[in-house]
Amino acid sequence: MANELTWHDVLAEEKQQPYFLNTLQTVASERQSGVTIYPPQKDVFNAFRFTELGDVKVVILGQDPYHGPGQAHGLAFSVRPGIATPPSLLNMYKELENTIPGFTRPNHGYLESWARQGVLLLNTVLTVRAGQAHSHASLGWETFTDKVISLINQHREGVVFLLWGSHAQKKGAIIDXQRHHVLKAPHPSPLSAHRGFFGCNHFVLANQWLEQRGETPIDWMPVLPAES
């Protein structure tokens, strides 16, 4: 069955491509020269570690990792326990409070429990220099994450893609909307959330789609590992 394929199966060849090796080398060289890069090396590929290809039900595309101390840990929009919840994620929580009965905003921004349920929290660029947004945007990560999206499109069926903002929507242009469920809205950033992210109902619609397919819906209440 297709959904038994792993990321290793489908990405092993891509990871040998010269552009990808160059990307890794550039990041490694910057780290070795004393530049602070987020997330830490061990966390760069956490999106794939926590959500195996065969388990992907929902894809949420981010853009850049957070560039503040201790924030980024390899999952889009998520921050480590003990770190203040960033504004875009607070707006996601606000939308959840307004649309999911019983949802109460957690006091943390750690989304591993989403990832463990099949929500691929994928940034389109996987590293960033401290304090410098988009500083690694041209290193080759976009090529790699384009490939990831095309592989999900090809090997999975019925995945919900939540595309927030123009960057994610351009990135998701290759998705076959006959084969997958594509939902679009403005970005949850405070700059754009009031233009239609609030009220988009995406978290509810994603679960309705999954239930129609006979799949377990996502429990959108983020739970810290010690609580689960």
UniProtKB/Swiss-Prot annotation:
Its main location: cytoplasm. Coiled coil: none annotated. Keywords: Cytoplasm, DNA damage, DNA repair, Hydrolase. The active site is at residue 64. The keyword Cytoplasm applies. Belongs to the uracil-DNA glycosylase (UDG) superfamily. UNG family. This is Uracil-DNA glycosylase. It comes from Escherichia coli O6:H1 (strain CFT073 / ATCC 700928 / UPEC).
